[in-house]
């Protein structure tokens, strides 16, 4: 918002600023637009409110000026009046219904503005009209916050008298007290405290009043707070006390006051830093550091990372502070948890003067730090030659003459070739750092240029990886081998070819926010890397050398997109064509395409004759570029004749399939426009899928439109007969579906199971898609039955999957379709899959028409619900008059179905709520009790027994003359046998094999016969013909005891699952599998 010229304003505004009432009246009589807007949407009324001329304002208001007009900042004339502190203008605006709750873009009301601008009279006029004085602006501040911020005692007092809350917090949980303390408004602070404000309040980050006052150096506020009993060592959320804050910001006067008041000079924060650490590192903390040292601060206190105050001073090279610390006993060689001493830190950040001080005071230059590095490692790694020289001059043992110059260099008192824990010497670090002066100093001091690290790399490998031309020249001139391979088989040439990737970042170079400023530096580095590669090639580096994976330098240059490096390698290599075309392990063309390096790819494409070489998976470079979505690479390859129809080996996808599946529309467009084949859009993969099908499966609408516009066949089917429309129905993409229908896709196409897209949309619950398909189907073939090859309709599928919206739509569309197709009705489908919502909808819509319907085997929905143990389904069916004792073609009721399948909940419901008949017999004369026992379902059998005392039911025999006791005994159901015996089951009844229930326990017929012979010899009872009615009655009454005797006999096994007699057709368990 700039300053506008008054001459550019409308005449009415000019007259207002001139305070010319008559001119204003004249302009208004001439029908001048009273609500005319300037560039910032301010009206003449805004101007009048700002100027504060009451007569003009009154004239404008009487002439119909908009009293609540808002400018671009949403400020109203009332805001302007409050800002100008003109209570008369404000009162006039209020009298003309100005909105007292109007908010600007910062959500500030006129009261906020009045409080911020010390407009006490305006605030007094506004306060009674507001429901609350604590309304917050966008930052959460109330009018009291603004009044305190302005430091106007009268306004603060007024707001408090009118009921403003003392402890209201902004979005950072700062109270008005925080602002009074921070800005040094002592009288305001005292007033707030006198009114009951909490001196111990903290904001969201735990800053108290003492912290805020210390931060801004408000010494008088600090003294007042200390007098009022403020906790002097109270930490904030980061563990910092007020003394930490004062030392960090260089507020030495506050620090003195705090120390004199007894602040703990050694209290650590959450990271273990004391105020002395903070003073040592801060910009303006020199006086604070001296104060702390003189008041007993521990100069050797270590943080959680082991850093002492001397470490902190070394980071920024605080020379004077370091001297003070050393003079007061700071340990010179104190190591942090990484092993770094202050000398390591000073070397890392290039503070030569501090290094001199530390060395003068006995710092150990041979001390190992991070990764077992010397300080010299760090100095040369980060390119500080002066520090390197200083460290080399320490502990002089002998003097040698440099081979490169006549300069005498003093050798260090440690072995310069000592490696770190990764085997890297100082020369490796210098080569990586790229400072040739450091490199020369080390070489002249006897550094071994052939020394290898643990990865087998020489210093030349590191120089090449960082593209350092001067270092490479120095090392090669000194005798470094240009073709030496590391553990991966890589020569320096491999790393030089990819030097932009391996180049070490420059941590001491500040990063620029402007990419244009970085570009010259990047270009300079690219040139240097190119010169480095060129130098290596000129000095015997072999471009045909392969690493252990089979990659040459050409592969590396292609993989990392260094076009100039690649061109140079191709030019210098005698067998470059063989390297480029080799696909073992992967060709350079594939590497460039995969990584999206179009410039490198273009270079290779211009060199190669065949661009359709394939990798071990059968993928071409064009396939990889398309799959990765690199449009520029696709454009390069297609322009040079790469084929879009070559298929990879696994799924037989072409680049078109890859583009469509990934949604790369631009790449797909380029592939189609290559014009390789007229039907290129209909090429199929191993499963018969076209690119159109894959685009729809993945919801890529743009690709779908493009393929259809380019002639893709909408009705093409895969090997299972499924078209793009089938896939659209499954994914539910309405836009894709609409595009297909616009291109005349056949809506009633069927797959290999006879299912149409309508079936799939119903099964997947896509209501909008289903509606569209049903409308299209009406116009295609309104008489189509709409059932698949198994006789199932879309209504069956919607019911089975529980999509009630789809079912509702289908019922509206064709209410009698439930009669079509498979007699296993939609209601059967809903209850067998526990879909309560669709069950309820079908019963509500069709009721008696469907509730007792039967499938091909005579089973009702009640049978299906019982089979699935669907109690809620059973309840709803019975509420709609389902026949509880209805039998299927085998004579079984729903209860018998539940009992046979062990569905305990269903059995319980049908017995207790449904009152199902237990005496119903199936075609083999089995009761529900027989069936429960035959499948070993103890709980179901016991439930049935708990509901009956009928001896006829308990001793009922099926067509094989077996009682429930025979079957329970055969299956080892001890608890059921006991219950049967307690209910009076006879133990002497024989089945058609002549076996009693006791003999039914035998594992097979032969064992049963043997057991019968033994028992007959033992003769525990009178012969059969001699048994009197009395003795039979006695046996019956003693059946429990008899059962216990048999059960306790170890000779008779329990739980045997094999029947002792051959199963007869139609005996127990027939049709036991309830499947459709």
From Swiss-Prot:
What taxonomic lineage is listed for the species of origin? Eukaryota, Metazoa, Chordata, Craniata, Vertebrata
Do the record's keywords include Phosphoprotein?
A: yes
Q: What does this protein do?
A: Putative regulatory subunit of protein phosphatase 6 (PP6) that may be involved in the recognition of phosphoprotein substrates.
Which residues does the annotated region (Disordered) include?
502-522
Short name of any one Pfam family annotated for the protein? Ank_4
Q: Does the keyword Lyase apply?
A: no
Q: How does it assemble?
A: Protein phosphatase 6 (PP6) holoenzyme is proposed to be a heterotrimeric complex formed by the catalytic subunit, a SAPS domain-containing subunit (PP6R) and an ankyrin repeat-domain containing regulatory subunit (ARS). Interacts with PPP6R1.
Annotated ANK repeats reside at: 7-36, 40-69, 73-102, 106-135, 139-168, 172-201, 205-234, 238-267, 271-301, 305-334, 338-367, 371-400, 422-451, 455-484, 488-545, 549-579, 584-613, 617-646, 651-680, 687-716, 720-749, 753-782, 790-819, 822-852, 857-886, 890-920, 924-953, 960-989
What InterPro entries does this protein map onto? Ankyrin_rpt, Ankyrin_rpt-contain_sf, Dendritic_Spine_Reg/Scaffold
What is the protein name stated in its UniProt record? Serine/threonine-protein phosphatase 6 regulatory ankyrin repeat subunit C
Native source organism of the sequence: Homo sapiens
Superkingdom of the source species: Eukaryota
- Which PANTHER family does its entry note? ANKYRIN REPEAT DOMAIN-CONTAINING PROTEIN 65 (PTHR24166:SF52), ROLLING PEBBLES, ISOFORM B (PTHR24166)
Q: Modified residue Phosphoserine is at which positions?
A: 1028, 1075
Q: What SUPFAM superfamilies is this protein classified in?
A: Ankyrin repeat (SSF48403)
Query: Keywords of this protein's UniProt record, alphabetized?
Result: ANK repeat, Phosphoprotein, Repeat
Q: Where is the composition biased (Basic and acidic residues)?
A: 502-514
Which Gene3D superfamilies does its entry note? Ankyrin repeat-containing domain (1.25.40.20)
